[in-house]
Design a protein with these regions (language model features):
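Active-/binding-site microenvironments in catalytic and ligand-binding cores
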Residues: 2-284
Length: 284
């Protein structure tokens, strides 16, 4: 991206640190890390599959007549009006950012858990690191040791407020029923390792930050141990954090670090999550 500015003399340019005369050059690549919200895809449990009712331009013309008494449809350009969509979905549909309130009413060992409208926006724009665990099988744990080894491999040290992205390859199954059981997942200890480093936002290209629910259910049935249930989510009871789920296209980033992620969530009052369109930004 090339930005050209014809600078004029004045205090605004001095405050902004811009040259009094000249050209500002910027080259960046923007990578969309979200999936598209679509109706009727079987990649969610039935109760969570989005529904979209589309109001086309012809129907919009009819609706506009209610807002403009006396308006005739042929008075509109081409006899057409506005288009609208009516959606029925959850805050966890599509790519979204979960708030600490999703996991439990409290966080940080007893403080009220933040809802998505309370998330500090500075958490959602930061340096990022991509950890590739595509070699792990569906339902496998990504352990604390796995995370440490991967960071050593890519020669990166986590900083406070870094955004950590976990790549499992599950996004390749998006749009199919198999998506619900695809990918490895984080556990309590690996999640806490990141949080203890000062990380506040993480993300994964799978349906859940934890291992897929059917794998958790099978392990619980076998062992009877409730600690296997939602263990990575429940880590947020100890240290509050947010995670993005249903991310996509992480392979397009093309590097393990040296990029920024922007992932501001939609601000919904008292909500456990908000839709987001995360973007990786790479300076070229």
């Amino acid at each position: 991206m090339k930005i050209e500015v014809e600078a004029k003399d004045g205090p605004w340019f001095k405050r902004m640190g811009l040259p009094q005369r000249g050209v500002i050059m910027a080259a960046r690549r923007f990578i969309d890390l979200s999936i598209t919200i679509e109706p009727s895809l079987p990649s969610d449990p039935p109760m969570m599959i989005p529904k979209i009712d589309y109001l086309d331009h012809a129907m919009g013309a009819v609706q506009m007549q209610d807002f403009f008494p006396g308006l005739k449809q042929d008075q509109l350009p081409g006899g057409l009006g506005w288009a609208l969509e009516f959606l029925s979905l959850t805050t966890h549909s599509g790519t979204h950012l979960d708030s600490p309130y999703h996991y439990h009413p409290t966080m940080d060992m007893g403080k009220p858990a933040m809802t998505v409208d309370e998330i500090p926006i500075e958490w959602c724009f930061s340096d990022a690191v991509l950890l590739d665990f595509r070699h792990k099988g569906d339902g496998e744990r990504i352990t604390r040791e796995d995370v440490i080894c991967k960071l050593d491999e890519i020669k990166y040290e986590i900083k406070p407020l870094d955004i950590v992205l976990i790549q499992t390859g599950a996004d390749r199954a998006w749009g199919t029923p198999e998506y619900l059981v695809k990918g490895a997942g984080m556990d309590r200890e690996s999640t806490l390792y990141l949080l203890e480093k000062g990380v506040k936002v993480v993300g994964i290209d799978a349906w859940s930050w934890d291992r897929p629910l059917p794998f958790l259910a099978k392990e619980f049935e076998k062992t009877g141990d409730p600690k296997v249930i939602w263990e990575a989510h429940f880590a947020g009871i100890e240290i509050g954090y947010c995670h993005m789920e249903k991310m996509a296209n992480l392979s397009a980033i093309g590097r393990p670090h040296g990029f920024t992620v922007c992932c501001f969530p939609i601000k919904i009052k008292r909500a456990s999550a908000g839709w987001t369109r995360p973007v990786a930004i790479i300076d070229l």
